[in-house]
A protein has these predicted regions:
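Soluble extracytoplasmic regions of secretory-pathway and membrane proteins
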Residues: 1-420
Length: 421
């Protein structure tokens, strides 16, 4: 393998141009290498503030940024989309949220070119008086959302931080009866898994009553002080439905297991417990991945990957997939095998056959060995979510591996360093 060198051809940054600017850069970065380097000439470009968060805040420090920027591909280019908020702590008669105050609006969509670093600021909420004031201060900085290219608009999604705030508020204010509200008789909570509050996650699914699948952001609720599930809430992101919030409640007389109850059932399952104990005895470390909560009809399917990392290994390896549905727990090598164990092999084969057909499949497929139902759209939802989690886990593992290598290199450098006093 050989190293491949390529010259930067973008318009990002600024030209070095002169010896004076070169000297100023050397002083700015406190190194003489810039001044005496033959590789840096008048046509060289200096790219500063390449971290997108730092870059954005240099321009709009008065905006609060979402914690989850996302990268999209549009018109052959890679661009970051950052959701930004206008916030205040002086809105009267409004509940305060830590870090955001008591007034929050997703007023701006920021688009950053990943190659050149150019930024565009689109006003997403023209009714927000704060962002309109800032627009009057900087009239050339902000653009109307209608000026955003149509292909880029298709990639816009509902921001996760705003949705978390709305879910937190709705957990209390969904109660409409004054007496019930005053006594907090039907208070909800965002569930916790492994002592950490669940974060909302994106998925593609067909909402109840809809005929097509769509991209949504979802979060479940549990009753206050209890572990069973009471409802789930979604934010829609597609087209004209963008920004619409929906809440679906489960019948109170029906027990729907919550995340912690499923975790307890997984840990109590004889097969799962035996396999984990066997791996632990061999000196390997068992890592339980992100728990996925996927609505299916009037119930839920839980999916959790199981990783195994050897003592000498760097990256965990996916070993098993655990699926929970109602009273059944299944652990298999693949998601398909675990679903087949719960719903029956015939149901999965029917779904697989319908995936190969161009026309719409039957609405439901019934397993001959089980009375449980699995829709093709439900199967695609589960499969898509699982693949997204696997991809994200792989990216995190690669980053962790690079960090470990950098730390080892730093340790070797420190060990070989000569300290002069």
């Amino acid at each position: 393998e050989k190293n491949v060198y390529k010259n930067y051809a973008g318009n990002g940054g600024f030209l070095v141009e002169s010896l004076i600017r070169k000297a100023l850069l050397a002083a700015r970065f406190k190194t003489l290498k810039i001044l005496f380097s033959q590789d840096i000439n008048s046509e060289s470009r200096v790219l500063m503030y390449r971290n997108i968060t730092e870059r954005v805040l240099k321009v709009v420090p008065f905006l609060r940024l979402d914690g989850d920027p996302y990268l999209v591909v549009t018109e052959g280019k890679m661009k970051w989309i950052y959701d930004a908020y206008t916030v205040s702590d002086r809105f009267p008669y409004s509940q305060t949220i830590p870090r955001f105050g008591n007034y929050v609006r997703n007023s701006v969509k920021i688009v950053i070119d990943a190659y050149e670093g150019s930024m565009d600021f689109f006003i997403a909420d023209p009714n927000d008086p704060i962002i309109l004031t800032w627009k009057n201060v900087f009239p050339e900085l902000f653009k109307e959302l209608g000026e955003m290219p149509e292909d880029l608009k298709k990639h816009i999604r509902y921001p996760s931080d705003l949705f978390t705030i709305q879910a937190f508020i709705y957990a209390t204010y969904h109660m409409k009866t004054p007496q019930v509200f005053y006594n907090k008789e039907d208070q909800w909570e965002i569930p916790e898994i492994d002592n950490k509050m669940m974060e909302p996650y994106y998925m593609i699914m067909k909402l109840p009553g809809n005929t097509t699948e769509e991209y949504i952001l979802m979060l479940p609720f549990t009753p206050r002080g209890k572990s069973n599930l009471s409802a789930w809430m979604v934010a829609q992101s597609d087209g004209e439905n963008y920004g619409h919030l929906r809440a679906y409640t489960f019948p109170k007389q029906k027990l729907i297991y919550g995340p912690n109850q499923i975790v307890a059932r997984i840990n109590q399952d004889a097969e799962v417990s035996r396999q984990i104990s066997l791996w632990d005895q061999r000196g390997s470390k068992v890592i339980q991945g992100t728990m996925l909560v996927i609505p299916i009809e009037e119930s839920l399917i839980y999916v959790r990957p199981l990783y195994l990392r050897a003592d000498a290994g760097k990256i965990p390896e996916l070993k098993r997939v655990i699926v929970g549905y109602e009273d059944t727990i299944a652990m298999e090598r693949t998601l398909e095998e675990a679903l087949a164990k719960i719903f029956g092999q015939d149901a999965l084969q029917s779904v697989a056959r319908s995936n190969d057909k161009k026309k719409d499949p039957p609405i439901k497929t019934l397993s001959s060995s089980s009375n449980m139902l699995l829709k093709q759209s439900d199967y695609r939802t589960i499969k898509n979510m699982f693949e997204r989690v696997m991809k994200r886990q792989e990216e995190m593992n690669q980053k962790l591996s690079h960090h470990k290598e950098d730390l080892k290199a730093l340790g070797k450098a420190l060990d070989s360093a000569v300290v002069v006093e």
